Amino acid sequence: MPIRTDRLVLRLFTPDDVDGMYAYQGLASVARYLYRPPRSREQCARLITRIADATRWERKGDALVLAVRRHDAPEIVGEVILTLDNAGAAQAEIGWVLHPAYEGRGYATEAARALAAVAFDRLGVHRLFARLDVENAGSIRVCERLGMRREAHLVENDRYDGRWGSEYVYAALAHELRH
């Protein structure tokens, strides 16, 4: 099941990945864009237990969460997520979370591009979208590099820690991103 790109391997999480996930999920700088507090190591362990074998793709909320690592190193650099939003309309949400130490190297774009190909070519997704904080410049660049268009600006649609957040919605149709 692993997905290989030029530089990365995308694979299901295993119990051995708890510390790797916690290394980025435990950071406030990462969690702020997810509108939630940083995760504890124990929360990461529970999450991995839940998602490690979650490969069902039938109803709203079913998700494929893959660990991302480089070919040349065993540590996890982040994760990519594909969540079924509407089975009847073949729509899914794509997302990514990267350890800040690995930002700016194109890993998020490379991993998201590979997961988008799986969504369109293997899972039959027609429309893929991403929701991201308007201040998340890195994720905005990833969406643009993928060829997604900005479809919406949701103003103060979420609130975390007493602060309102706004989101952009980017999307693309299968025929627009297939090469």
Protein language model annotation of sequence segments:
Residues 1-32, 49, 65-179:
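Acyl-donor (CoA/ACP) binding surface of acyl/acetyltransferases
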Residues 37-62, 67:
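Active-site rim helix/loop that mediates acceptor-substrate recognition in acyltransferases
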